[in-house]
Structures are given as structure tokens and as C-alpha cells.
Amino acid sequence: METILFQPLIVPAKTAVLLVFVPDSLTQQIVVNRLLERVGAELGDVVRITRVDQVVHPEVVRSFGVQQLPSFILLRQGAEIWRHNGLPDLADLMRLLTERLQEATNW
């Protein structure tokens, strides 16, 4: 049996992590990837975007209780601060992320 070693994800404490649970459909993956490219360009180092493929990491999908794909989960210092199921448009996604990040920094 082959052992696969994974490198830990090391993220500075001030950086939030956006977990994006991607669907199997290639068409939807392309749409999600384009959306995430724009989000990454807008938010830069404020958010680290990590795609989670349900086929490759089913245990991660289960651990977060994801029922619908795509799903977006925003984490700050290991705590979930926001979740969205389905595909939002860019303006809505940016507004929601920005609001949650601002709220999280005011704790």
C-alpha cells in the first residue's frame, strides 16, 4: 500500500482561509475556478483560497458537513466564520467575504 504524505497548510494567523468544495462537473469547475481567480486578485494576501475536491478528499468534505457543491467555507484562526452553499456571483461573494472578514477582525 502506497503512503501519501501531505505537507501541512501553514497560514499566518491574520490570514483567513477560504475552503472551496468543488463539484465533479468539469463545466462547474471551470466556472468556480474563474470566480476564484477574480476573488484572489481582489483580496490578495488577505485570504488563502484552498480548493477541496470531494473525490480526492471525501473525509474533509464529510468533516465539514458539506451537502451541496460548490460550497464555500471561510475560516479565521481555525474557526468557521461564514458558509455559503451554491455558486454566488462575484459581486455577492466579494461583499459577503469582505463583510465577514471585517467582522472577524473586530472580535
Protein language model annotation of sequence segments:
Residues 1-2, 21-23, 40, 44-59:
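Thiol-based oxidoreductase modules, predominantly thioredoxin-like and allied folds used
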Residues 32-35, 64-67, 87-89:
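Short, glycine/charged-enriched secondary-structure capping and boundary segments
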Residues 73-107:
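Non-catalytic, surface beta->alpha helical segment in thiol-disulfide oxidoreductase systems
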